[in-house]
């Protein structure tokens, strides 16, 4: 009986979270215009590209593996770099703490529109223990993978910023086009008025 009650409560919890739009942690509601795109990378099977691909799929984005498609938006990974800086040292001068930095540069290409550059910087602090060299290397690799995953999440989130900028540009172009049409119409009306003013008055013969 207790088992049935627990199962019922669990089912209700699932329904409630589904009804309120609950999403998995780290996922992003990508706009429909960007839910199908190309993923371009010079290292398509590298750990960073794999993390980005996984994050896109978690966000319900369909990745089209056809570079000949020019009608779809594209997320292009320009490059990435990792730096390691010393933050603190022991009394004997040996490094005690590092800061790991991951820089990622990318672009979003919208067909027939603009190219939007994206930059992501991820920081992590790593404590160096010279007595546990093997554990240190394993921990550093775990941190680097976490940084790649976080960079992938931020890249996908910035698709929302790109979409907002695209809407703003479309509105501004529409306003500019409307203003241009109005100016053209006013100029035509002025030409018509000038022509009418320049015409001599036509007199009607008296009967």
UniProtKB/Swiss-Prot annotation:
It is found in: Cell outer membrane. A lipid is attached at residue 20 (N-palmitoyl cysteine). Its main location: membrane. Coiled coil: none annotated. A lipid is attached at residue 20 (S-diacylglycerol cysteine). Residues 1-19 form the signal peptide. HAMAP family: LPS_assembly_LptE (MF_01186). This is LPS-assembly lipoprotein LptE. It comes from Yersinia enterocolitica serotype O:8 / biotype 1B (strain NCTC 13174 / 8081). The gene is lptE.
